[in-house]
Design a protein with these regions (language model features):
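Generic short beta-strand segments
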Residues: 1-11, 100, 150, 207
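Extracellular beta-strand-rich solenoid/capping regions of secreted or surface-exposed proteins
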Residues: 3-43, 52-71, 78-95, 163-176, ...
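Long amphipathic alpha-helical scaffold regions
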Residues: 6, 198-227
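All-beta strand scaffolds that present successive hydrophobic residues in beta-strands
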Residues: 43-46, 67-72, 155-159, 178-182, ...
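Short, exposed beta-strand/loop patches in secreted or surface proteins that constitute
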Residues: 44, 83-91, 124-138
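Extended Gly/Ser/Thr-rich low-complexity repeat segments
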Residues: 74-76, 103-131, 149-169, 175
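Generic recognition of long tandem-repeat/solenoid scaffolds
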Residues: 93-101, 137-150
Length: 227
């Protein structure tokens, strides 16, 4: 499967530490999960079902649709395109992270373009994102990174996406009258919803939120629209 093959390639480190440079480019081949190209006057009644994606792909494709609705769909990944961990130690010029929720076993090749830190003091994002310049894998799924952090962040959760942009979870392109009701996105290897050259998109009760037990969801923007 091409989606799993791409995931394996990226996670091996073959695309480097910023994989979007290799795959977030015009005409890069990609897999579509649910493809509704050309559909008209249709409603998808998901009733809370989860579309669990196996490999890196575009979850839902709405190309040239008209009067199309999706109700009650959740989108997530079988293996998340990000890893979460806990900061276990902070020194003057480095810090150590144990990845208790790794996408797979962490190696020196695993791509980490940045890290987001959940600051328990404010119950929100720490003010800065950090590049992840690792020094060593010091134990299974335990990595020492270069960088300076305040000591109080010991015990904080970090979310480490394995790429920035790739395909969106839902892509709406050259479509008219699209409605998303109670749609949830728990994770994606890029943006949540992207609309391009599209008229009249209605989103009711959209939830771009972490899956249960996680602090972070999509790797980049929740939504992004362009004319």
């Amino acid at each position: 499967d091409k989606a799993v093959e791409l995931e394996n390639t990226v996670m091996s480190g073959a695309y480097g530490q910023n994989p979007e440079r290799k795959m977030f480019i015009p005409y890069h081949d990609y897999v579509r999960g649910l493809d509704f190209t050309g559909a008209k006057n249709a409603t998808i009644m998901a009733n809370g079902a989860t579309l669990l994606l196996d490999g890196w792909m575009e979850g839902v494709s709405l190309e040239k649709t008209n009067n199309f609705k999706i109700k009650g769909l959740c989108i997530d990944f079988l293996r998340k395109p990000m890893s979460e961990g806990i900061i276990t130690d902070i020194q003057n010029d480095n810090y150590t992270v144990y990845f208790d929720k790794p996408a797979r076993e962490i190696t020196m090749g695993t791509p980490f373009p940045r890290v987001n830190i959940w600051d328990n003091k404010i119950d929100g994002h720490y003010r800065d994102t950090h590049g992840m310049n690792r020094e060593a894998v010091v134990a299974p799924n335990t990595v020492r990174f270069k960088g300076q952090l305040p000591k109080y962040l010991v015990g904080a959760t970090i979310g480490a996406p394995h790429t920035f942009h790739y395909r969106p979870a839902i892509f709406i392109h050259e479509s008219v009258n699209t409605t998303l009701d109670n749609v949830t996105i728990n994770g994606n290897c890029g943006m949540g919803i992207v609309g391009f050259h599209t008229n009249t998109v209605t989103m009711n009760h959209l939830n771009v939120v972490p899956a249960k037990g996680f602090k972070f969801s999509t790797n980049t923007d929740a939504t992004h629209f362009a004319a």
